[in-house]
Design a protein with these regions (language model features):
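Gram-negative outer-membrane beta-barrel domains
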Residues: 3-9, 14, 20-425
Length: 425
């Protein structure tokens, strides 16, 4: 996963590099030329994310474990239709087909005595989704989504024991879509998916539910898209991204702890968890060219992204929580129509983890450093306020729990945040 995060950033920045030079300096209020959001569109994109399998085994003292984790990336094809209901409200439906390698993996290498590997992969699936959005500018749509999701899972092992199964579920999320030029738009969105995998023929003995946290970026071609005076019922605000800003955000995400056992003889990726977080930030952006913005930012976050074990029948529970941390990041973005910024980011990340159990005296906490990278879209709501949707992947140094190398946990995190920023000057 050390390079997989670059998929979303590459899609965002490569699209902005291809924009025409006619998107002039947008620090003054543009004319009220609208955009035609009505009609069919097709799209291609990809994304990155994590999965958490929650396992319940009823005979084992009410055993519930959330959970078994995995991560990876995927590609996606989209077809959809939108209708502009009012000057600012857009509603539509779309279908996506995706293929990828989001997986939980186990590798054991004790050669020449024993070797084994296995993985459970989300290899392909599709969604049928409705969405409704609000035009924060004539060419930038903020939206929420929800619908049906179908996912195929495949178990592959090195000993010839393989199986596959399908699961139905639902998906919820939100995002931003911005016009690039002409018929082309770019969207970035977060989706939470929930699937009931059932009991695998074991009756009430076993129950498995899986959830996914994914970030999607897609380039779309709109057959009826383009500038139109008919849609120009309101003008975009005047905003300059350069300046000092403070912000608040909230989001969802997943953590995956990759386990190295006995110095690497066994590797399991991994132990998963999920949850929500809040965030405050301060940053400064510079205008380095007519449409290019570069900046630095510091964030502090707190939350409950956690792995949970519950043995209610024995009166025992335990959790490992990513409870607070901070990032120091730099970002580079391109300003498109109507004061909308498409950007990539990278920097350092610090995270605190807390292990709590219901047994007095058995607790543990640790700090770890790492790096983070990601991408997002930010749009001006007024001459002082912007809104953004942003994905970050973070990877941290391992922790051996004072085991002398017998066990090491290497955490990585996938988070999506929705935020508001206020420009001070």
């Amino acid at each position: 996963m050390k390079t997989a995060y670059s998929l979303a950033s590459a899609l965002l920045l490569s699209s902005s590099l291809s924009l025409p030079a006619t998107a002039a300096d947008l620090t003054t209020a543009p004319t009220a030329t609208g955009y035609n959001w009505n009609g069919f569109y097709v799209g291609v994109g990809g994304g990155i994310g994590a999965i958490t399998h929650e396992i319940g085994i009823s005979p084992l003292a009410g055993f519930e474990f959330n959970g078994i984790g995995g991560e990876g990336y995927f590609g996606e094809l989209t077809v959809g239709y939108d209708m502009q209901l009012t000057e600012r409200i857009v509603a539509g439906v779309f279908a996506t087909y995706r293929a990828g390698n989001m997986a939980t993996t186990l590798d054991i290498d004790a050669a020449p005595f024993f070797t084994f590997d296995a993985d459970v992969t989300l290899d392909h699936g599709y969604d049928v989704i409705g969405r409704v959005g609000y035009l924060v500018t004539p060419n930038t749509l903020a939206y929420v989504l929800g619908g049906y999701s179908h996912q195929h899972f495949a178990l592959d092992t090195s000993i010839g024991f393989d199986m596959d199964w399908d699961a139905d579920g639902y998906v919820l999320g939100g995002g931003l879509e911005a016009v690039l030029a002409g018929n082309w738009t770019l969207k970035s969105e977060y989706r939470y998916g929930q699937y009931d995998l059932g009991n695998f023929g074991l009756g009430s003995f076993l129950d498995v539910e899986s959830s996914t946290h994914t970030f999607h970026t897609a380039l779309a071609y709109r057959f009826g898209g383009g500038a139109t005076a008919a849609a120009a019922a309101f003008a975009p605000v005047s905003y300059d991204f350069a300046g000092l800003k403070v912000g608040i955000a909230g989001g969802l995400g997943a953590v995956v702890h990759e386990l190295d056992i006995l110095g690497g003889i066994a590797n399991f990726n991994g132990i998963g968890g999920e949850g929500a977080f809040g965030e405050v930030s301060i940053g400064y952006d510079f205008r380095i060219a007519p449409n290019w913005i570069a900046g630095v930012q510091a964030d502090y976050r707190w939350g409950n992204i956690s792995t949970d074990l519950d043995l209610s029948g024995l009166g025992f529970d335990a959790s490992i929580t990513a409870d607070h941390g901070y990032d120091l990041i730099a970002r580079l973005g391109y300003e498109v129509y109507d004061n909308t910024l498409i950007y990539g980011l990278a920097g350092m990340s610090w995270q605190h983890f807390q292990l709590d159990t219901s047994i007095s005296g058995i607790d543990y906490d640790w700090d770890t450093h790492g790096w983070t990278a990601g991408a997002g879209i930010e749009a001006a709501l007024s001459d002082r306020v912007t809104a953004k949707v942003e994905y970050r992947y973070a990877e941290y140094d391992g922790e051996d729990f004072e085991s002398g190398g017998i066990l090491e946990a290497i955490p990585s995190m996938h988070t999506v945040r929705f935020g508001l920023s206020y420009k001070i000057f």
